[in-house]
Every structure is written in C-alpha cells, then in structure tokens.
C-alpha cells in the first residue's frame, strides 16, 4: 500500500477525489452556516444539507448501507425531532441577535486551535495512505449485514435495550408532573403567555 | 482516494461542531452541533473501515458497525436531550445555556427571565446545589 | 488470713470505698456516709490486727512482680516493720475520726459525696505509702495524696482564697516532687531496685556512689511534702480547705509522709554527712521561723498550720540527729493532738462564726458554748506546749534528748553540729510554742466583750470525736515511751533530766510571759472593736467556715493577720510581728524569684505567639483565601466556559503529547 501510495500524488486527483472534495466543501460550508447562522430554523435546514452531504460522502466511500441509514435516521428523523424541539421551545422565527453567547471568541480560539492541531496530525500521519476503492464495495448492505449479524450481534441487541431505555427516559422527562399541569392550567387563564412575551 | 481527504474533512467538521457547542446560546443549537461532531466521527470511522477492509486480510467491519451504533445512540441522545431541554424550558421559561447558572456562587434565583412558577423550582435547585 | 493479706486489704478497703462513693454518690445518697466511714474503720481494725501480728518483731516482707517493666523492676512489695505498723494505726485512727467528724461538719454540703470519696482515696494512698516496700509504688501513693490534697483544699472553690491555695499547694509540692522523682530514679539506678530492703542493704554494704546527691534530691521532695523550709509556704494557705481536711492532711498524715519517708530510708541519709547537716539546718530554720510566724497569725487555723510546720521541724530535727524512733514517736503523738486541735478549732469556728482570733477575743463566754471543744483543746494545747504529763512532752523530750545525745558526741550517727543546731533551735521553739499555744488559748477562750452568739449545740458526733482524740493526746506519750523502743530501733525514748528541765522550763516561761503580755494588752480590746463574722452562722459548720475565710480579707485587709492592738503576740514580737505575720516575706521572695520571671516569660511567649507565630498562621490562612477568591471568579456557572477551558487544556495537552512523541 505504501508502495502503491507513492504513485498517487495530490496534484493528479482522480474523479472520485474531485467529487469528494466538492461535496466535502459543500458539507463543510453547510456545517459552518449551521453553527453561525442567526436564524434558528435556518440552522436546522443547513444541518440537513450538511448531513445529506455526508451521506453522499459515504456513498463515495462505497459505504452505501451507512449512507442510506444516514439519510433515513439523520435527515429523516433527527432533524424533524430538532425542528419539533425548536417549535416546542417557541424559538423565534427570523433573525435573533443573541443566538451566540458571549463565549464566542473563546470558542473560536479553541476550535481553530484544535482544528489546526488535528489537521496537522492527521495530514502528517496519513498523507501517503491510499484507499483502494475499486473492486467490490466495502460497505454494501450484504457485507455490512453479514458482519453485523455474525460478529456484532450481542452489542446490537444490547443497543436495542439502550434505545428502549432512552425511549422510556425521554417519555418520563417530557411528561408533565401534576403540579406542572396545574400551573399550566392556571397560566392558561392569563391573557398572554409570559414566556412568549419574555422571549 | 487519499485517506487524507476524509480525515481532514472529518477533523474540520468536528471542530465546526466544537465551535457550535461552545458558542451557541440556544440548547437546541448546541444539540445540533453535537450531531455535527458525531457525524464527523462517523465519517472517520467509515473512511478508515474502507481503507482497512482493503488493506487487511480479514476484517470485522468494525468501523461500519460502530458507525451504525453511533447513529443509533445519537438518535437516542437527541431524544433524551430534547426531552431535557423541553423540561428545562418548561421550568425556567428559557433554553439558553448561559442563563442556567445555578452552580455559580452568589447566583440569584430570581433572574429577570424566570417567571413565578420557575422561581420555586430554581430556589429548590439552588438549595440542592448549595 | 495471713498478715500479708490483711496488710493488702488495709489500703484496698478505703480505695474501694472511694470508688463506690464516687459511683453511688448521686444515685444513692443514703449510702454515702456508711461508705465513707465503714471502709476506713475496717482499715483501722485491720491495721491494728497487722500491728498486733507484727508485734514489733521482724519486718514482714512480701513481694510480687506483676509484669516486667524494663530495666529496674517495679514490684508490688510490702515492708511492714514497727514504724509502718504504728504509723498505719495513726493514719487509720485519724482518718476514721475525720470521716466521722465530717459527717457532722459537712452535714448540709451538696458536695459531701465527692468530698468523702476523696478523703477515702487519700487515706488509701497514705496507707499505701506507709506499707509499701517499693519506692515506685510509694511514689504512686505519694502523688495520689498530692492530687487529693489539691482537690480537698479547693473544696470551697467558690472562694478565690481556696482556688489560689489549692493551686499553690499543688505547684509547690510538685516543685519538690520533681527532684524527688529524679532522686528516686538515681537511687534505683545505682542500686538496681526500687525495693527498700535492697536499698538499705546496698547502703549497709556502702555501695552507693553518690549518696549526698541522692539524699539532697530526695530531701527536696520531703521538704515539699512535709512543708519544711523553704517549701512550706503552701501549708498555711492550705487552711482555706475545710477543717477536717486540714486535720487529716495537713496535720496528721500527708505532711507526715515526708518525715516517714526519711525515717524509712534514714541509713541512706546517714551515709551523707552533708545531707544530715542540711536536714538539721532545714529543721532549725523551719522550727523557729514557723513558731514566730504562728505567734503573729490571726486566723486560728493558720496558727495551727504554722505550729504543724514547727512540729514537723522537730521530727526532721530528730531525723537529722539519726534517731528515727524519736521522730516517729513525735509523729504519732503530734498526729493525735494536732488532729484534735484542728477538729476542735472547727467546732470553735462554727460556734463563734469566725476564724479570727481577734474577733474571738471580743466574745465573752465562748468556752461555755463549746465545753467539749474547750476542754479537749486545752488538753491538746498543753500537749503541744509539751507540758508533762501530756503526750507531747514525752515525744518532744525524746527529740531533744536525741539531739543532746548527738551534741555531746555520744553517737556516730550524725555530726555534732547537727545535734547542737537541733538542740538550740528545739529549745527556742519550745519557748515560742508554749507562747503561741497560750496566746491561742487566751484569745479564744478568755475573750471579753459582747456575749458569744448562741448557734445551738454542736453535732454530737463532732464532740464525741474530740474526746476520742483527747485520750491519746493526754496519755499516749506517758504510756508508750517505754514500749515503743521495742517496735523501733531500740533507742531509749525516756526523757533525760537535763532536757526535761530545760524544755519544760522554757515552755513555762513562754506561757507565763504570754499571759503577762495578755494581761497587759487585753484591756485594749474593748477600745478597738473588730470582727469578721460569717453571714449565715446558723448554717452547717462547713458553710460557716467558708464564709469566715471569705470574710477575713475584706474585714482586716489581709488573710493572715488582723490590726489588733490587744494581741499579746504583737507586744511580744515587737517589730518582728509585721514580718512574722506574712511568713517572713517568703511569698514575696518567691514572687520575685519565680513568679515574676515566669510571668515575664509567659508574656514574652504570648507576645511572640501573637505577633510572630500568628503572622505566619494568618498568612497561611490568607494566601489560600486570596487564591480561592481568584479561583472563585472563574466559577461563573456558565457550562460553556467550563467546557471551553476543559477543551483548551485538552488541546494543549494533546499537542504537547504529539510533540513529545515525535521528538520535536
């Protein structure tokens, strides 16, 4: 592989690499917009773009099963959940000036520093490593399924228990207690919800 | 394909998510940033799994299996996380992380953003943390 | 039961009584009095039995070693010779009398249970000292007596006098006990044992290297315990305790422990001529000084206290002449009549409502109020003044005879100088003793002025005890001086003609001169009314006494003396009176020599502690405070800030780890 990698330079990219780079740029841009935009709903929508871009990257890496799972669960379920969350917390539609906390510059410093460190290390370690994408797909549904149900059955079943626990936990957490419900009833009598006014 | 491309993209996505976690005020936006970080890790896992499945004689496809697990756990996480954010929002009337400062010294439970029913809970919390 | 078992029971019974008294004192008040009296009485009976079995013959020795204790073995040893047997009887008799007397004297005292238990404990410790054949075990009893004395002197701890006196008694005796302990250890190191018999054997075989050093160190402890010059100052102040305590501890037993100790180890002291001379000088100074001071005191109990010091001086004088038979003989008779004097004084204080002789001399008919105390006290005072045929005469004459024996060079036991010192001082003291005894009697019972207050009859038990003690005061000397040599070393204790005539003569002179002086001065009494009287004369005797002691200083401006021109002592002593009243300024000397330097050192230490040490302490507290305040500013409660700091640190660490790993 190291010998083979010697013949692949960064200055002569293959088609897959070009496609990966372009989609990667789109994904990264969408991600940056997700964390910087001042409109909360837009952030959720840009997140959809970023996650979808990642699904494309998975496809380019021949991991097709992961890619479809990504589309199904992230784009389909998680983003919808987040949008519901935004709606239930009465997130304002439109630009909100205080979307970023005062911690922004510290966050930027830390993020840039860690990005520099990570990129430096990763590039330094893997600049000659080459992924052979020809041949049978590494992440086809058959391959993934076989490995999942041959080698990973026990963690898979344990994970189902975890998901069940998370399900129950989420229900318990979002249930209203009696006292809270009583409050809600009394608050319904007031002409306008205070929270909306405050927000 | 050079392994460096997905690896660098993953690192950059991770740091973007990191920035979001540290800089965003709304708890749901923070959760979204966490999703970004998780996805960056997933990309890393998939890329290295593809590379190793070619390089090694036998492989367990552990990278892809772990990616699937991560996705499942992320789904669970976002469910629980949103439930917590909703509960906090219901009790405090806000989901801004930098307003939840009960652990600080000299914390005033009667902040301007808290309404009447929230006061009792906040006071209880302040007592519990004190 | 064997003699050994009986002898072991003697100290054990009062100890058990004390423990039971302390445990049951609150829960079962009805048992306190029997628990106080009966064990002591039983111990007395057993002590008599032990003495009867021992019979003055060979000493009874019994040893058991509980456990090895290191280099020099400490053994539970009994060594009962004639001295021990007889002194134990004295201790038992006086302790029983005092316990009986206390049931009346502290009739209504709320602290009676602990008081009685402490007296029992004290009695037990004294028995231990008397019977013990091992010096370490003896020291245990010695120190228990010290601490009991501390508690009992401070029985009226509400009054500042009692508090100060108990502390003083404790500290001064401890001052002597430190060299005493060092001396004991040095002695044991040289001999290789704490056993008295072995030590005496080593002395007999002349194998001690430093007899003088050891003897002088031991003498310091003896001086502290037996109230000899210069460590006697605690005894007059200890009169702030209840009268029965004074009778038991400060007259008959504890102060006798030092004399008894020297008597036991006399061959050791005889091995050092210097120690004998020091002992003689100490005795002489003590005798004369205390007799002069006694003549100037106003508090009746302080007179008796100084007289105790003087009589103890006689005993140490006898020891200095190498005649322990005479010393212990005087110890026995003195124990009887001095206990009687104190107990009678307690009755008088109760009846008169005051402890001041000046106030008593202005009361008419006090003797008719307390006829029992009057007669018994007269007997005891005659014994004290050594008038034949009272017991004090025989014992004192035996002391003087021994001194004359040595002075005229008939013995090798002690240097002649010691003999002359003791003889001359003894005669002078005999004169002074008779003088202050007469003064006490005249002032207390021959008062003129207002009628003495009537507080009803004294408790029967108190009067009965007086008569019990009057018997030995009257007759012990005359009956015993022929028998005692069989129990002791065999020295003849019969009075010699020369010293008898001389001693009785000077005693008579002292008495007559004092009477004359009193006739001269008592007319002045009516002109200067004086008096300090207890606020509640109808209370029980202990309460009256406590109040009388507390009232003395406010009334007269001094604890010891009163500005009374009708006092014959004032006329007799002349310019010396002022100094004698305060014990020849010895307390002031101690204050200048020890108390002030110690206080100065203490204030220096306090200054250093406050200004130097505390600075560091405050800095050690303040620096973390500042750091904490700085760190606290970081605790904003904002989770994002925390995570930012955490991740920044992680990045730094990771980069550092990578740099180290790549060798950059």
UniProtKB/Swiss-Prot annotation, chain B:
Chief location: membrane
Species this chain originates from: Streptomyces coelicolor (strain ATCC BAA-471 / A3(2) / M145)
Assembly with partners or alone: NDH-1 is composed of 14 different subunits. Subunits NuoA, H, J, K, L, M, N constitute the membrane sector of the complex.
Taxon lineage: Bacteria, Bacillati, Actinomycetota, Actinomycetes, Kitasatosporales
Protein name from the UniProt record: NADH-quinone oxidoreductase subunit K 1
Subcellular location: Cell membrane
One Gene Ontology biological process: ATP synthesis coupled electron transport
Documented EC number(s): 7.1.1.-
HAMAP family per record: NDH1_NuoK
GO cellular component: NADH dehydrogenase complex; plasma membrane
């Amino acid at each position: 592989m190291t010998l083979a990698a010697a013949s692949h330079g960064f200055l002569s990219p293959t088609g897959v690499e070009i496609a990966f780079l372009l989609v990667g740029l789109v994904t990264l841009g969408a991600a940056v917009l997700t964390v910087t935009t001042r409109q909360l709903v837009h952030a959720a929508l840009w997140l959809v773009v970023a996650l979808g871009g990642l699904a494309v990257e998975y496809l380019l890496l021949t991991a097709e099963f992961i890619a479809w799972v990504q589309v199904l669960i992230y784009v389909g379920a998680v983003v919808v959940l987040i949008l519901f969350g935004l709606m239930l917390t009465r997130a304002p539609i439109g630009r909100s000036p205080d979307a970023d906390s005062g911690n922004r510059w510290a966050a930027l410093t830390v993020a840039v520093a860690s990005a520099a460190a990570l990129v430096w290390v990763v590039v330094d370690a893997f600049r000659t490593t080459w992924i052979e994408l020809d041949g049978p797909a590494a992440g086809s549904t058959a391959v993934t399924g076989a490995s999942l149900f041959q080698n990973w059955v026990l963690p898979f079943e344990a994970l189902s228990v975890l998901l069940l626990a998370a399900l129950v936990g989420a229900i318990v957490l979002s249930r209203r207690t009696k006292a809270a419900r009583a409050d809600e009833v009394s608050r319904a009598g007031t002409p306008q919800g205070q929270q909306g006014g405050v927000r | 394909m050079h392994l460096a491309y997905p690896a660098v993209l993953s690192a950059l996505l991770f740091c973007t998510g990191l920035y979001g976690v540290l800089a965003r005020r709304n708890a749901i936006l923070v959760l979204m940033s966490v999703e970004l970080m998780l996805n960056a890790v997933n990309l890393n896992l998939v890329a290295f799994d593809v590379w190793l499945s070619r390089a090694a004689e036998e492989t367990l496809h552990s990278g892809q299996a772990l990616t699937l697990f991560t996705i499942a756990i992320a789904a669970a996480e976002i469910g629980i996380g949103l439930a917590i954010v909703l509960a906090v929002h219901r009790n405090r009337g806000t989901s801004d992380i930098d307003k939840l400062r009960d652990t600080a010294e000299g914390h005033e439970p009667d902040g301007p953003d808290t309404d009447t029913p929230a006061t009792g809970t906040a006071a209880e919390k302040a007592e519990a943390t004190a | 039961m064997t003699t050994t078992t009986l002898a072991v029971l003697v100290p054990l019974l009062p100890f058990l009584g004390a423990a039971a008294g302390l445990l049951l004192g609150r829960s079962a008040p009805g048992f306190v009095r029997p628990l106080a009296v009966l064990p002591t009485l039983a111990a007395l009976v057993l002590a008599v039995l032990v003495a009867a079995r021992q019979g003055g013959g060979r000493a009874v020795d019994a040893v058991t070693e509980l456990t090895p204790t290191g280099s020099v073995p400490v053994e539970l040893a009994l060594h009962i010779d004639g001295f021990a047997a007889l002194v134990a009887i004295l201790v038992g008799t006086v302790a029983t009398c005092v316990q009986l007397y206390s049931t009346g004297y502290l009739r209504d005292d709320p602290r009676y249970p602990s008081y009685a238990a402490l007296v029992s404990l004290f009695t037990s410790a004294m028995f231990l000292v008397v019977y013990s054949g091992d010096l370490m075990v003896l020291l245990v009893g010695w120190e228990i007596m010290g601490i009991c004395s501390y508690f009992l002197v401070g029985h009226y701890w509400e009054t500042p006098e009692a508090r100060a006196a108990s502390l003083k008694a404790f500290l001064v005796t401890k001052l002597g006990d430190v060299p005493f302990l060092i001396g004991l250890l040095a002695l044991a190191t040289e001999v290789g044992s704490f056993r008295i018999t072995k030590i005496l054997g080593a002395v007999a075989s002349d194998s001690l290297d430093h007899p003088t050093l050891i003897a002088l160190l031991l003498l310091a402890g003896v001086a502290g315990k037996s109230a000899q010059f210069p460590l006697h100052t605690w005894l007059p102040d200890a009169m702030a305790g209840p009268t029965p305590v004074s009778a038991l501890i400060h007259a008959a037993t504890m102060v006798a422990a030092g004399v008894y100790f020297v008597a036991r180890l006399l061959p050791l002291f005889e091995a050092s001529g210097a120690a004998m001379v020091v002992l003689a000088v100490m005795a002489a100074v003590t005798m004369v000084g205390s007799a002069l001071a006694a003549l100037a005191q106003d508090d009746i109990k302080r007179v008796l206290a100084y007289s105790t010091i003087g009589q103890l001086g006689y005993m140490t004088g006898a020891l200095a002449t190498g005649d322990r038979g005479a010393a212990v003989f005087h110890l026995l008779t003195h124990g009887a009549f001095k206990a009687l004097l104190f107990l009678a004084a307690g009755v008088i204080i109760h009846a008169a409502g005051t402890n001041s002789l000046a106030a008593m001399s202005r009361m008419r008919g006090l003797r008719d109020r307390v006829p029992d105390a009057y007669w018994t006290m007269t007997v005891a005072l005659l014994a004290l003044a050594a008038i034949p045929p009272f017991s004090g005469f025989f014992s004192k004459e035996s002391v003087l005879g021994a001194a004359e024996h040595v002075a005229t060079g008939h013995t090798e036991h002690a240097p002649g100088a010691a003999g002359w010192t003791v003889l001359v001082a003894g005669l002078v003291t005999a004169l002074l003793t008779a003088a202050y005894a007469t003064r006490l009697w005249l002032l207390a019972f021959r008062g003129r002025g207002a009628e003495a207050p009537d507080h009803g009859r004294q408790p029967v038990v108190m009067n009965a005890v007086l008569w019990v003690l009057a018997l030995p005061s009257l007759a012990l000397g005359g009956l015993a001086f022929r028998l005692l040599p069989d129990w002791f070393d065999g020295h003849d204790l019969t009075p010699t003609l020369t010293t008898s005539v001389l001693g009785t003569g000077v005693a008579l002179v002292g008495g007559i001169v004092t009477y004359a002086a009193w006739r001269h001065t008592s007319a002045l009494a009516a002109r200067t009314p004086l008096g300090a009287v207890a606020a509640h004369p109808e209370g029980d005797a202990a309460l009256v006494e406590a109040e009388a002691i507390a009232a003395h200083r406010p009334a007269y401006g001094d604890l010891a003396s009163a500005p009374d021109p009708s006092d014959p002592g004032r006329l007799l002593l002349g310019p010396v009176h002022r100094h004698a009243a305060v014990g020849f300024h010895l307390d002031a000397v101690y204050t200048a020599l020890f108390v002030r330097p110690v206080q100065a050192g203490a204030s220096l230490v306090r200054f250093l502690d406050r200004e130097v040490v505390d600075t560091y302490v405050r800095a050690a507290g303040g620096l973390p405070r500042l750091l904490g305040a700085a760190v606290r500013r970081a605790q904003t409660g904002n989770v994002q800030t925390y995570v930012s700091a955490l991740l920044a640190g992680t990045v730094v660490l990771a980069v550092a780890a990578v740099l180290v790993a790549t060798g950059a």
